[in-house]
Amino acid sequence: MGFTPSRYVPDVWYKLREDGEGYDYIATYVDDFLITAKDAWSYMRHLQSVYTIKEPAHPEIYLGALYTGQPSQDWTISCKNYIKEAITRIEHQYGTLSEEKSPSIMGDHPEQDDLTILNNEQHREYQSLIRMVQWLVTLGTLDICYAISSLSCFSCCPREGHITLLFRVWGYLKKFPNKSIGICAQDPVYEEPLEEFRADFEDQYEYASEEIDLAFPEPKGKPIATSIFFDSDHAHDTETRQSISGVLVVVGSTPVSWMSKHQGAVATSTYSAEFCAMRLATEEAITIQYMLCSLGIPVNEPTKLCGDNLRVIQNASMPEATLQKKHIA
Protein backbone atom coordinates (compact mmCIF):
# COMPACT_ATOMS: atom_id res chain seq x y z
CA MET A 1 0.00 0.00 0.00
CA GLY A 2 3.03 2.25 -0.04
CA PHE A 3 3.39 2.87 3.70
CA THR A 4 6.79 3.49 5.31
CA PRO A 5 7.65 2.64 8.93
CA SER A 6 8.56 5.62 11.06
CA ARG A 7 12.25 5.81 11.90
CA TYR A 8 11.67 6.41 15.61
CA VAL A 9 8.25 4.77 16.05
CA PRO A 10 8.57 1.57 13.98
CA ASP A 11 5.06 0.38 14.95
CA VAL A 12 3.57 3.40 13.17
CA TRP A 13 3.55 3.49 9.35
CA TYR A 14 2.92 6.62 7.29
CA LYS A 15 2.07 7.46 3.69
CA LEU A 16 1.75 10.82 1.93
CA ARG A 17 -1.81 11.54 0.82
CA GLU A 18 -2.59 11.99 -2.85
CA ASP A 19 -3.34 15.69 -2.35
CA GLY A 20 0.06 16.11 -0.67
CA GLU A 21 -1.44 18.01 2.27
CA GLY A 22 -0.72 15.46 4.97
CA TYR A 23 -0.06 11.84 5.86
CA ASP A 24 -2.17 8.77 6.54
CA TYR A 25 -1.10 6.48 9.38
CA ILE A 26 -1.44 2.87 10.45
CA ALA A 27 -0.49 1.96 14.03
CA THR A 28 0.14 -1.72 14.77
CA TYR A 29 0.38 -3.68 18.00
CA VAL A 30 0.74 -7.48 17.85
CA ASP A 31 -2.44 -8.49 15.95
CA ASP A 32 -4.28 -5.17 16.37
CA PHE A 33 -4.01 -2.14 14.12
CA LEU A 34 -5.52 1.34 13.95
CA ILE A 35 -5.89 3.37 10.75
CA THR A 36 -5.94 7.17 10.82
CA ALA A 37 -6.57 8.48 7.32
CA LYS A 38 -8.84 10.63 5.17
CA ASP A 39 -10.28 7.49 3.60
CA ALA A 40 -9.52 4.78 6.14
CA TRP A 41 -11.99 2.32 4.65
CA SER A 42 -10.12 2.16 1.34
CA TYR A 43 -7.09 0.81 3.23
CA MET A 44 -9.32 -1.48 5.26
CA ARG A 45 -10.85 -3.00 2.12
CA HIS A 46 -7.39 -3.56 0.69
CA LEU A 47 -6.29 -5.35 3.86
CA GLN A 48 -9.47 -7.43 3.87
CA SER A 49 -8.67 -8.62 0.36
CA VAL A 50 -5.38 -10.06 1.64
CA TYR A 51 -6.02 -10.94 5.30
CA THR A 52 -8.92 -12.09 7.42
CA ILE A 53 -9.91 -9.03 9.45
CA LYS A 54 -11.97 -9.57 12.61
CA GLU A 55 -14.77 -7.04 13.11
CA PRO A 56 -13.47 -4.00 11.17
CA ALA A 57 -15.19 -0.85 12.43
CA HIS A 58 -14.63 2.66 13.70
CA PRO A 59 -12.35 2.45 16.74
CA GLU A 60 -14.19 1.68 19.97
CA ILE A 61 -11.73 -0.31 22.07
CA TYR A 62 -8.02 -0.36 21.32
CA LEU A 63 -5.53 -1.99 23.70
CA GLY A 64 -8.16 -1.83 26.46
CA ALA A 65 -8.96 1.88 26.08
CA LEU A 66 -12.42 3.03 25.01
CA TYR A 67 -12.54 5.55 22.15
CA THR A 68 -15.70 7.68 21.97
CA GLY A 69 -16.55 10.07 19.14
CA GLN A 70 -17.16 10.33 15.43
CA PRO A 71 -14.83 11.24 12.54
CA SER A 72 -16.28 14.79 12.41
CA GLN A 73 -16.22 15.30 16.19
CA ASP A 74 -13.72 15.44 19.01
CA TRP A 75 -12.72 12.13 20.53
CA THR A 76 -12.21 11.03 24.11
CA ILE A 77 -10.23 8.13 25.55
CA SER A 78 -11.33 6.40 28.74
CA CYS A 79 -10.73 3.13 30.58
CA LYS A 80 -14.18 2.72 32.12
CA ASN A 81 -14.84 -0.73 30.64
CA TYR A 82 -11.46 -2.05 31.80
CA ILE A 83 -11.97 -0.49 35.25
CA LYS A 84 -15.45 -1.91 35.74
CA GLU A 85 -14.40 -5.40 34.67
CA ALA A 86 -11.33 -5.30 36.92
CA ILE A 87 -13.33 -4.09 39.94
CA THR A 88 -15.89 -6.85 39.42
CA ARG A 89 -13.09 -9.42 39.55
CA ILE A 90 -11.45 -7.80 42.58
CA GLU A 91 -14.70 -7.57 44.56
CA HIS A 92 -15.54 -11.17 43.71
CA GLN A 93 -12.21 -12.22 45.25
CA TYR A 94 -11.71 -9.71 48.09
CA GLY A 95 -15.17 -8.33 48.87
CA THR A 96 -16.79 -4.96 48.29
CA LEU A 97 -14.42 -2.02 47.84
CA SER A 98 -15.21 1.21 49.66
CA GLU A 99 -15.41 4.23 47.36
CA GLU A 100 -12.69 6.85 47.90
CA LYS A 101 -12.53 10.52 46.90
CA SER A 102 -8.77 10.47 46.26
CA PRO A 103 -6.28 7.77 45.20
CA SER A 104 -3.94 8.48 48.12
CA ILE A 105 -3.93 10.13 51.53
CA MET A 106 -2.40 13.59 51.74
CA GLY A 107 0.99 13.41 53.42
CA ASP A 108 1.11 9.63 53.11
CA HIS A 109 4.54 7.96 53.13
CA PRO A 110 4.40 4.26 52.19
CA GLU A 111 8.13 3.91 52.91
CA GLN A 112 7.37 4.37 56.64
CA ASP A 113 5.07 1.33 56.76
CA ASP A 114 6.34 -1.14 59.38
CA LEU A 115 3.41 -3.57 59.37
CA THR A 116 3.75 -7.29 58.64
CA ILE A 117 5.32 -8.33 55.34
CA LEU A 118 2.84 -10.11 53.07
CA ASN A 119 3.16 -13.87 52.66
CA ASN A 120 3.98 -15.43 49.29
CA GLU A 121 0.36 -15.74 48.15
CA GLN A 122 -0.49 -12.18 49.19
CA HIS A 123 2.73 -11.01 47.54
CA ARG A 124 1.63 -12.48 44.20
CA GLU A 125 -1.81 -10.91 44.59
CA TYR A 126 -0.24 -7.51 45.28
CA GLN A 127 1.93 -7.74 42.17
CA SER A 128 -1.08 -8.78 40.08
CA LEU A 129 -3.13 -5.82 41.31
CA ILE A 130 -0.21 -3.45 40.70
CA ARG A 131 0.26 -4.68 37.12
CA MET A 132 -3.44 -4.21 36.38
CA VAL A 133 -3.47 -0.64 37.62
CA GLN A 134 -0.12 0.16 35.95
CA TRP A 135 -1.73 -0.69 32.62
CA LEU A 136 -4.54 1.73 33.46
CA VAL A 137 -1.96 4.48 34.01
CA THR A 138 -0.42 3.64 30.63
CA LEU A 139 -3.81 3.81 28.91
CA GLY A 140 -4.66 7.24 30.28
CA THR A 141 -5.69 7.18 33.95
CA LEU A 142 -3.05 9.75 34.79
CA ASP A 143 -4.70 10.96 38.02
CA ILE A 144 -3.43 7.83 39.80
CA CYS A 145 0.07 8.04 38.31
CA TYR A 146 1.77 9.30 41.48
CA ALA A 147 0.01 6.85 43.81
CA ILE A 148 0.87 3.84 41.65
CA SER A 149 4.44 4.97 41.06
CA SER A 150 4.87 5.18 44.84
CA LEU A 151 3.32 1.77 45.57
CA SER A 152 5.20 0.08 42.71
CA CYS A 153 8.44 0.68 44.60
CA PHE A 154 7.39 -2.01 47.09
CA SER A 155 6.46 -4.77 44.63
CA CYS A 156 9.42 -6.88 45.78
CA CYS A 157 8.53 -6.74 49.48
CA PRO A 158 5.06 -5.29 50.12
CA ARG A 159 3.56 -4.94 53.57
CA GLU A 160 -0.02 -4.93 54.82
CA GLY A 161 -0.17 -1.15 54.72
CA HIS A 162 0.85 -1.13 51.07
CA ILE A 163 -1.94 -3.43 49.94
CA THR A 164 -4.40 -1.35 51.96
CA LEU A 165 -3.28 1.74 50.04
CA LEU A 166 -3.55 -0.22 46.79
CA PHE A 167 -7.16 -1.13 47.57
CA ARG A 168 -7.74 2.57 48.21
CA VAL A 169 -6.64 3.31 44.63
CA TRP A 170 -9.12 0.75 43.33
CA GLY A 171 -11.79 2.31 45.56
CA TYR A 172 -11.06 5.67 43.93
CA LEU A 173 -11.38 4.11 40.48
CA LYS A 174 -14.68 2.56 41.55
CA LYS A 175 -16.05 5.99 42.49
CA PHE A 176 -14.75 7.72 39.33
CA PRO A 177 -14.66 5.10 36.54
CA ASN A 178 -15.80 7.44 33.75
CA LYS A 179 -12.95 9.96 33.68
CA SER A 180 -11.54 10.43 30.20
CA ILE A 181 -8.95 12.36 28.19
CA GLY A 182 -10.23 14.70 25.51
CA ILE A 183 -8.31 14.70 22.22
CA CYS A 184 -7.85 18.28 21.03
CA ALA A 185 -5.30 19.52 18.49
CA GLN A 186 -5.86 23.20 19.31
CA ASP A 187 -2.93 25.06 20.80
CA PRO A 188 -3.20 25.66 24.55
CA VAL A 189 -3.91 29.16 25.85
CA TYR A 190 -1.42 30.56 28.36
CA GLU A 191 -2.65 33.19 30.78
CA GLU A 192 0.78 34.65 31.54
CA PRO A 193 2.80 36.48 28.82
CA LEU A 194 5.74 34.44 27.60
CA GLU A 195 7.75 37.22 25.94
CA GLU A 196 10.07 37.62 28.93
CA PHE A 197 11.17 34.00 28.52
CA ARG A 198 11.76 34.20 24.75
CA ALA A 199 15.49 34.77 25.08
CA ASP A 200 17.82 34.73 22.08
CA PHE A 201 20.75 32.40 22.72
CA GLU A 202 22.51 33.08 19.40
CA ASP A 203 24.99 35.44 21.06
CA GLN A 204 26.15 32.70 23.44
CA TYR A 205 25.79 29.79 21.00
CA GLU A 206 26.58 31.36 17.65
CA TYR A 207 27.19 28.12 15.75
CA ALA A 208 24.59 25.94 17.47
CA SER A 209 21.83 24.41 15.37
CA GLU A 210 19.25 21.70 15.77
CA GLU A 211 20.17 18.31 14.36
CA ILE A 212 17.67 17.22 11.74
CA ASP A 213 17.56 13.59 10.68
CA LEU A 214 17.69 13.49 6.88
CA ALA A 215 15.51 10.38 6.94
CA PHE A 216 12.57 12.34 8.35
CA PRO A 217 9.62 12.81 5.96
CA GLU A 218 8.85 16.32 4.77
CA PRO A 219 6.55 18.09 7.26
CA LYS A 220 3.00 18.40 5.95
CA GLY A 221 -0.22 19.78 7.36
CA LYS A 222 -1.00 22.13 10.23
CA PRO A 223 1.83 22.79 12.71
CA ILE A 224 1.20 21.64 16.25
CA ALA A 225 2.43 23.02 19.56
CA THR A 226 4.00 20.97 22.34
CA SER A 227 4.10 21.79 26.04
CA ILE A 228 5.50 20.04 29.10
CA PHE A 229 4.45 20.69 32.68
CA PHE A 230 6.88 19.64 35.40
CA ASP A 231 7.13 19.82 39.17
CA SER A 232 9.04 18.22 42.01
CA ASP A 233 8.49 17.27 45.64
CA HIS A 234 11.76 17.90 47.46
CA ALA A 235 12.97 15.11 49.78
CA HIS A 236 9.59 13.38 49.67
CA ASP A 237 11.06 9.99 50.55
CA THR A 238 11.79 10.19 54.27
CA GLU A 239 14.08 7.14 54.17
CA THR A 240 16.37 8.04 51.25
CA ARG A 241 15.67 11.80 51.07
CA GLN A 242 15.05 11.41 47.34
CA SER A 243 12.83 13.92 45.61
CA ILE A 244 10.06 13.05 43.17
CA SER A 245 9.73 14.46 39.65
CA GLY A 246 6.37 14.76 37.93
CA VAL A 247 6.11 15.39 34.17
CA LEU A 248 3.10 15.83 31.89
CA VAL A 249 3.62 16.04 28.10
CA VAL A 250 0.91 17.82 26.10
CA VAL A 251 0.61 17.86 22.29
CA GLY A 252 -1.83 20.53 21.20
CA SER A 253 -4.15 20.45 24.20
CA THR A 254 -4.04 16.67 24.64
CA PRO A 255 -2.00 14.91 27.34
CA VAL A 256 0.02 12.18 25.63
CA SER A 257 2.62 11.14 28.20
CA TRP A 258 3.04 11.39 31.96
CA MET A 259 5.32 10.08 34.67
CA SER A 260 6.07 10.32 38.37
CA LYS A 261 9.42 8.95 39.47
CA HIS A 262 12.13 9.25 42.10
CA GLN A 263 15.08 11.42 41.14
CA GLY A 264 18.37 9.61 40.68
CA ALA A 265 20.34 12.11 42.79
CA VAL A 266 19.57 13.42 46.27
CA ALA A 267 18.74 17.10 45.85
CA THR A 268 20.00 19.37 48.62
CA SER A 269 17.38 22.07 48.03
CA THR A 270 13.99 22.72 46.47
CA TYR A 271 15.78 24.66 43.73
CA SER A 272 17.95 21.66 42.92
CA ALA A 273 14.96 19.29 42.88
CA GLU A 274 13.08 21.59 40.50
CA PHE A 275 16.09 21.79 38.21
CA CYS A 276 16.32 17.98 38.11
CA ALA A 277 12.63 17.84 37.18
CA MET A 278 13.26 20.39 34.42
CA ARG A 279 16.10 18.24 33.08
CA LEU A 280 13.71 15.28 32.85
CA ALA A 281 11.16 17.51 31.11
CA THR A 282 13.83 18.61 28.63
CA GLU A 283 14.59 14.99 27.76
CA GLU A 284 10.89 14.40 27.16
CA ALA A 285 10.76 17.53 24.98
CA ILE A 286 13.50 16.17 22.74
CA THR A 287 11.74 12.81 22.54
CA ILE A 288 8.33 14.20 21.60
CA GLN A 289 9.80 16.64 19.05
CA TYR A 290 11.69 13.84 17.30
CA MET A 291 8.69 11.55 17.43
CA LEU A 292 6.41 14.11 15.77
CA CYS A 293 9.04 15.03 13.17
CA SER A 294 9.55 11.35 12.34
CA LEU A 295 5.84 11.18 11.48
CA GLY A 296 5.96 14.22 9.19
CA ILE A 297 4.09 16.50 11.60
CA PRO A 298 5.26 20.15 11.49
CA VAL A 299 6.64 21.43 14.80
CA ASN A 300 7.67 25.04 14.21
CA GLU A 301 7.98 26.24 17.80
CA PRO A 302 10.17 25.05 20.67
CA THR A 303 8.47 22.99 23.35
CA LYS A 304 7.25 25.19 26.19
CA LEU A 305 8.35 24.03 29.66
CA CYS A 306 5.93 25.11 32.38
CA GLY A 307 6.85 24.99 36.06
CA ASP A 308 5.98 26.76 39.30
CA ASN A 309 9.49 27.86 40.33
CA LEU A 310 10.14 31.22 38.67
CA ARG A 311 13.82 31.34 39.67
CA VAL A 312 14.56 28.00 38.04
CA ILE A 313 12.76 29.03 34.84
CA GLN A 314 14.58 32.37 34.70
CA ASN A 315 18.01 30.79 35.23
CA ALA A 316 17.30 28.28 32.46
CA SER A 317 15.69 30.76 30.05
CA MET A 318 17.83 33.88 30.20
CA PRO A 319 21.39 33.88 28.84
CA GLU A 320 22.42 36.69 31.18
CA ALA A 321 21.23 34.81 34.30
CA THR A 322 23.94 33.70 36.72
CA LEU A 323 23.31 30.09 37.68
CA GLN A 324 24.28 29.50 41.31
CA LYS A 325 25.73 26.04 40.87
CA LYS A 326 26.55 25.64 44.54
CA HIS A 327 22.84 25.11 45.21
CA ILE A 328 22.55 22.22 42.74
CA ALA A 329 23.50 18.72 43.88
Language-model features: locations:
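Long, low-complexity, charge-biased intrinsically disordered regions
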Residues: M1-A329
